[in-house]
């Protein structure tokens, strides 16, 4: 399974939920979303800065994208960015193979 890093923001609607229940545990909601599609949530952290939360999960890209779609469609979250962990060495190895055969336009 791939590892995904997901960052996002709460909307005004999401923040209104916190005002109604300041002790709400959103990590449980994130866990429920991951469980619904067979993904594994590894951690949930609230943030100060450009993003309001950070989730680390394992699964497929389709599972991560489904979580994004459903949670943003709820109206409580927005701006979810999904980043997939990669091996930069594997990427570089592929780039070397491509560079040996690729020809730029006009060459």
Where are these regions (language model features)?
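A compositional/biophysical signature of low hydrophobicity enriched in polar/charged and small residues
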Residues: 1-107
